[in-house]
Amino acid sequence: MLTAIELANQFQASLVGEASTVFNGLAPLERAQSSQISFLSNPLYRKQAADSSAGALIVSKADLEFLQANPGTHSSGRVYFVAKNPYATFARVAQYFARQSAPIYEPGIHSAAVVDPSASIPASCHIGPFVRIGAGVKLGERVAILGNTFVAENCDIASDTLIYPAVSLYFGTQIGERCIIHSGAVIGADGFGFAPDFSATGGEWVKIPQTGNVVIGSDVEIGASTTIDRGAMSDTIIGSGSKIDNQVQIAHNVVVGNCCVIAGCAAISGSTKIGNFCIIGGAANFAGHLTIADRTTVSGNTSIIRSITEPGQHYTGVYPSMLHGAWEKNAAILRGLDKIRQRLRLLDKNKSTES
């Protein structure tokens, strides 16, 4: 375990308090004990932080000044880690403690795995039971592929990527370094492409071969049961640093930029391009062939049916979506619609009486 000063130095925080103190983990403010670290990133919780039993708090400079001026019942002897972004610092400290108890995937190929002789698998990789690895697959160093995962022909998985059980990677899928792919994800299935060929008496939907691949950058996390379809003639691309929640559908030829977050049950239709640093709420949906500007925020359950060209905007609503501020005003009017109706009826009645 690292001492307080070692933690502060490793995570670029200023230390206030005893440098030699050692902590054994993290906990929320209401449950943290003297041997644990918690954090404060929202001024609304300052009073709770002051009264917390936590032995250390990760705080901003402004919150530190408040807590020192307003000490709680357990503040004596507390250590403070002062950071520009307490929430992000908490996340990095949490990663450190999580590594202490994380499973260790020993290098080697399980006897129940089926690996094509042409696959390139470094000795540092872990291949779990009942994994199937196809011809021409290339793995980087320290890749871990857990049980019952299917890796089809010519997939390329870069170093330090972790793939949980029961993931399906179709042929030609490319995955960057340090990615995490959770159970049940299906990457590289055919995109939903069919050409109509109908006449007055019948016809059919003609399948369009999906000959592109899926290309995933580095430091991407993909949630459980998420599906990312392969491109029709060009690739479906997920940019580096993006995080995708559970049960998200990403259709063929979609391009997701770098460092985007996409919450559960969102759906992005074919050939839509999402810019960098976008935030997409749960169950939001996008029509196809749109372009979404960088740093766009889309609220949950919002339907986007037109391209968004101005960066940094926040959209909310269903048919039509609109700027978030306009939606809030309209929602307030909608909540008071019955009162407005009653007032209009009264005005109409008074007008009739006067005439």
UniProtKB/Swiss-Prot annotation:
Tell me the route in metabolism or biology where this protein functions.
Answer: Bacterial outer membrane biogenesis; LPS lipid A biosynthesis
Question: What top-level branch of life does the organism fall under?
Answer: Bacteria
Chain segments annotated as transmembrane: none
Catalysed reaction equations from the record: a UDP-3-O-[(3R)-3-hydroxyacyl]-alpha-D-glucosamine + a (3R)-hydroxyacyl-[ACP] = a UDP-2-N,3-O-bis[(3R)-3-hydroxyacyl]-alpha-D-glucosamine + holo-[ACP] + H(+)
State one molecular function term (GO).
Answer: N-acyltransferase activity
Q: Name one GO cellular component term.
A: membrane
What are the EC numbers?
2.3.1.191
Q: One GO BP annotation here?
A: lipid A biosynthetic process
> Keywords on this record?
Acyltransferase, Lipid A biosynthesis, Lipid biosynthesis, Lipid metabolism, Repeat, Transferase
* Broadest EC class assigned to this enzyme: transferase
Q: Which residues form a coiled coil?
A: none
Q: Where is the active site?
A: 252 (proton acceptor)
Q: Which InterPro entries match?
A: Hexapep, Hexapep_transf_CS, LpxD, Trimer_LpxA-like_sf, UDP_GlcNAc_AcTrfase_non-rep
Q: Which family does it belong to?
A: Belongs to the transferase hexapeptide repeat family. LpxD subfamily.
Q: Which HAMAP family match?
A: LpxD
PANTHER family this protein is in? UDP-3-O-ACYLGLUCOSAMINE N-ACYLTRANSFERASE, UDP-3-O-ACYLGLUCOSAMINE N-ACYLTRANSFERASE 1, MITOCHONDRIAL-RELATED
Q: What does this protein do?
A: Catalyzes the N-acylation of UDP-3-O-acylglucosamine using 3-hydroxyacyl-ACP as the acyl donor. Is involved in the biosynthesis of lipid A, a phosphorylated glycolipid that anchors the lipopolysaccharide to the outer membrane of the cell.
Its assembly, as annotated, is: Homotrimer.
> What's the protein here called?
UDP-3-O-acylglucosamine N-acyltransferase
